[in-house]
C-alpha cells in the first residue's frame, strides 16, 4: 500500500512542536458532552500565531451561528477561508491527518481546490476548521488515490473505534470513528455541524473508480488524549 505524503506534511510535523498547545490551568474552559463522558478541555489561547487562532475560532463560531448558509454551493467548498501566508507562515499546510490503522499521514489544506486535493487532504470551506471546540464538524476531503499515492483509497477499511489524529499549528487532537455513512452528493445535511458535538468527517468518492456517484463518510468524535492508552502512537 503506497501511502506517500506530500513533502510539506513531513516538514510540518518536524516543526509543529515549536508551537505547543497551552492548557488552561484554571480548568474553567471545559465542556461536558454527556455526564458519562470524560471532560475534554475547550481550546484556549496559544502562545504562537495568536491572531490566526482567534480569527479561525471566530470563523468556526460564525459559520455555526449562521447555519452554514453557503454549504450547498459547490464553489464555496474550494475558496480557502484563510491563507497561511497572510499570517507569516511559509506553507499553506494547516495540519496533518494521521490514521494509524491505515498507516497514513497526509497534509491538510484549507479549501478543496484542485491543487490542494492533488497535494493531500483538504478542509471543505464553510465547514469547521479542524482545531477542536464544541459545535464543530471539520469535513476533510481526500481523493481515493492520486498520482501514485493512495490517499483515502482504503478509507473503507476504517471501523468504529479506530483512531484519527489531527495535528494542527497548536495541538494534537484525537478522534474516534463513530459512524460510517454512504450518501448522495446532494445530501449536504449529512455534513453539517451537529450542535453540542465536536466532530471531524472524512469524505471521499464512492464506490472506488466510479466517477463519484456517491460519497463515503467517516464520522469521528473527539476523545481525550491519553498518552499511556492503547491509542498512543510513536
Residue ranges of each PLM-predicted region?
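Solvent-exposed, non-transmembrane regions of membrane-associated and secreted proteins
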Residues: 1-159, 163-234
